[in-house]
Amino acid sequence: MKRSNNYLLCLLCCQFLLSGVSAEDKKYSFTEEHIELSNEIIQILENYHFTKKKYPSIKKEALGSYLDRLDPGRNIFLQKEIDSFLSENNNDDPYDQQASLGKAFKIFDLYRTRYIARYARQKKMLSEIESLDLKQNRKILKDRSEASRPDNLENLKLLWDDILINDVIQLRLSGNDLPETKTKLTKRLNNQFNFFEQTKSEDVLDL
């Protein structure tokens, strides 16, 4: 049963992500074809899949899964934003796919804005690596999949700082000097960002 539910969520995540989303051309829009395909997926779930669950009963769970896939490390969205997304979802017509896809795009736009802001902030920190305080008495969870999300932007930015500082410390403990650490982390950030910028809808659907 758990496997079948995961299959349902996978299909529904595809429905939320059907988009033509392309960070490459910076355009985020969906077409009538995407809406039609979303409706077809819903019909399959409700009428042909062996669980035959009604879409409204699992829409919130599907949106939650979409958010977790976008932000598994819980360092992009604030808790109040997650609560707002899920609350708005409860008030929507579950079968209005134009509204659902529009909301998914709005969420992805915020995700991309935050991703870029985090990248820029951490790059700046690396450019000033010699002045970083590596003796802070703060802990960071290696696995944040179950961690609490930040409650405001200030704490979110502090989390970004902590993540970068932790990466610096780990490389230093592995025997890298500051220049080597700076080079390696800068390369890592750039590679991750370049990969993100090349994302196309087909890639997102493979999540």
Specify the residue positions occupied by each region the protein language model found:
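Flexible, low-complexity junctional segments that flank or bridge functional domains
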Residues: 22-207
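Compositionally biased regions
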Residues: 5, 20-23
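Bacterial N-terminal signal peptides that target proteins for export
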Residues: 2-8
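Bacterial N-terminal signal peptides
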Residues: 10-16
